[in-house]
Regions:
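Repeated loop/turn-to-beta-strand initiation elements of outer-membrane beta-barrel proteins
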Residues: 69-73, 105-111, 119, 155-159, ...
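Transmembrane beta-strands of outer-membrane beta-barrel pores
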Residues: 49-53, 67-69, 78-82, 115-119, ...
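Conserved C-terminal beta-signal and adjacent last beta-strands/turns
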Residues: 87, 100-102, 425-530
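Gram-negative outer-membrane beta-barrel transporters
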Residues: 260-266, 357-370, 381-461
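Structural signature of Gram-negative outer-membrane beta-barrels, strongest in the C-terminal barrel
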Residues: 203-218, 242-356, 361-362, 397-400, ...
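Surface-exposed extracellular loop regions of Gram-negative outer-membrane beta-barrel proteins
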Residues: 119, 125-128, 228, 233, ...
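Flexible loop and strand-edge segments within Gram-negative outer membrane beta-barrel domains
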Residues: 86, 94, 108-195, 232, ...
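Outer-membrane beta-barrel translocator/receptor signature
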Residues: 8-95, 106-107
């Protein structure tokens, strides 16, 4: 839906980047902060860089331009770090080419090509940071081609079409697997996935009624091979070779409406149908959606939603289907073929011009398929149930013209309904974040953020042969000092993560987007636009 413009396409924003370059990253501005208020023909150059301890460095460079009805963006992104321990390194390169052509206000075409290659060690997130493989290595390569079009035959109608093709390969080897009890064991594997997805959507806006309807089709073929060598003390005299081929097809259709009712109420209704054919699970499901947004007074918004979803492959985490219902997220990184029911309620409150606060709580019940192997070599697919409760409360305040304060509390509890489930761990986490930013007239911006985490859970202990309870409670402080260059050229900042070098045991929910740094780390960053 975006009109033709001069905003650069950042290669890094299309990827789930490694944690070392994103944790505590609230100071770094996005490139669109330097965009002009009015669109003019011409070229733009945007760049950013980072350098720090543990061999950390990276850069992002983008050239973009606008000439009448044609716009383009060329970008590259590079990052590397040695991490906080042995074999915790990451090296990644991303290249992006984007073009958009709009011969008239009613019609627009766009195309994008992305290439990503990465090499990593054992960067898996475990509650015990001392448990890792010193020999695990992984190399990945992904090519993505995306095309899209928008046609608006009338002011109340929009028609969208999108197509994505992706080719993904990975190779991994581990000469000392963490989860293998046999000395001298080794594992080597390779995999490739070729997939494409096509989607179409129609959007209609009739004053008090907005309607969205669409459909999509995905086809994916994956080939995997693995060699298991249990070593001289293993149960088998030689290596075991495993070859697997899997094909997935997914067809979905959906319709959503947003209806404005009297009393400042907006009602959201929806229905999606999903047909999923795969080796692990076949599904045919209808998923109802319902949401309500009510503004009983100026500055007050009350939200509620209930809906069911079916997890499917999303190439590059992209889809035309609406991802939220009344502000509640629908799609997560669940295993393909999972089903979930989520319901929740929330409130957002604005007080004057200096305070924004709110809270929400929701429940999400999941059914997750998992393939399990039997001693005779056969395998079966079992369905495991997990109940998750999440809560959030926040307050953003600007008590003074140059002072901004933030407070946020987050809660999450995952409760598997079966014992010794292989797909989820009993886990309860409380997280509190307190932050302050001061904007001085000379261009300096000191910032500080304090994060408190209290986590308890049941984790599998290989030496004990079962699950044991573990937890930790700790504080982490991050600080930064930024400087805004004259004439809005850019910013420069120095950032110190985990100021007091706090040691802790914490299980990340998303290992590639860590909320806290494992150790003290000093970084310098810059962003510039010309």
């Amino acid at each position: 839906l975006q009109p033709i413009n001069t905003l650069p396409v950042q290669p890094s924003l299309g990827e789930r980047r490694p944690a070392y370059l994103t944790a505590a990253d609230s100071l770094t501005p996005a490139f669109n902060e330097y965009a002009e208020l009015f669109v003019n023909d011409g070229l733009g150059l945007y760049g950013s860089g980072i350098v720090g301890e543990n061999g950390t460095m990276g850069d992002e460079l983008i050239v973009n331009g606008l000439y009448g009805t044609f716009a383009f963006s060329l970008g590259q992104y590079y990052e590397q770090t040695d991490g906080f321990r042995e074999n915790d390194d990451i090296e990644q390169r991303i290249y992006d080419v984007f073009a958009q052509y709009s011969p008239s206000p009613a019609f627009s075409l766009q195309a994008e090509y992305r290439f990503n290659e990465a090499e990593t060690g054992d960067i898996g997130a475990r509650i015990d940071h001392a448990v890792y493989s010193p020999t695990y290595r992984q190399e990945t390569e992904r090519e993505t081609v995306r095309v899209g079009a928008r046609y608006s035959p009338a002011s109340v109608w929009d028609v969208l079409v999108s197509g994505i093709y992706q080719d993904y390969t990975e190779d991994a080897i581990d000469e000392s697997p963490v989860e293998n009890p046999f000395p001298g064991a080794a594992v080597e594997g390779a995999g490739s996935t070729e997939a494409y997805i096509g989607e179409g959507q129609v959007i209609a806006q009739f004053g008090w009624l907005d309607a969205i309807a669409g459909a999509g089709y995905l086809n994916s073929e994956r080939n995997d091979s693995a060699v298991f060598d249990f070593g001289p003390f293993g149960p088998f005299p030689g290596p075991i070779v495993s070859v697997d081929e899997d094909r997935e097809e997914h067809l979905n259709a959906y319709a959503y409406t947003h209806i404005d009712l009297p009393g400042a109420i907006q009602l959201t209704t929806g229905l999606s149908g999903n047909r999923h054919d795969a080796e692990i699970r076949d599904l045919n499901r209808l998923n109802p959606k319902a949401g309500l947004t009510w503004q009983p007074a100026a500055g007050t918004t009350i939200r509620a939603a209930a809906f069911r979803t079916t997890s499917r492959i999303l190439l590059s985490d992209l889809t035309l289907e609406p991802t939220h219902v009344a502000g509640f997220q629908q799609f997560y990184d669940d295993p393909v073929g999972s089903e979930a029911v989520r319901y929740g309620i929330g409130i957002d409150q604005r007080v004057g011009h200096c305070l924004m606060a709110g809270a929400e709580i929701s429940r999400r019940d999941r059914e997750i398929p998992a393939e399990q192997s039997a001693p005779d070599g056969s395998s079966t697919v079992n369905i495991f149930e997990v109940e998750s409760t999440t809560g959030r409360a926040y307050a953003y305040c600007t008590p003074l013209r140059r002072l901004a304060l933030t407070t946020e509390y987050a809660y999450r509890q995952d409760e598997p309904q079966q014992e010794n489930t292989p797909i989820a761990t009993q886990l309860e986490t409380h997280r509190v974040e307190l932050g302050a930013s001061l904007f001085l007239p000379v261009g300096l911006t000191p910032r500080i953020r304090t994060t408190y985490i209290d986590q308890d859970g049941e984790f599998f202990d290989m030496m004990a042969g079962g699950f044991t309870g573990r937890g930790d409670e700790f504080w982490v402080v991050d600080a930064a000092l930024g400087y805004h260059l004259p004439r809005r050229i850019g910013t420069f900042s120095i950032e110190l993560r985990n100021v007091f070098d706090e040691e802790f045991n914490y299980q990340e929910y998303d290992p590639l987007n860590s909320v806290v740094s494992e150790g003290r780390m000093l970084l310098a960053k810059f962003t510039a636009a010309f």
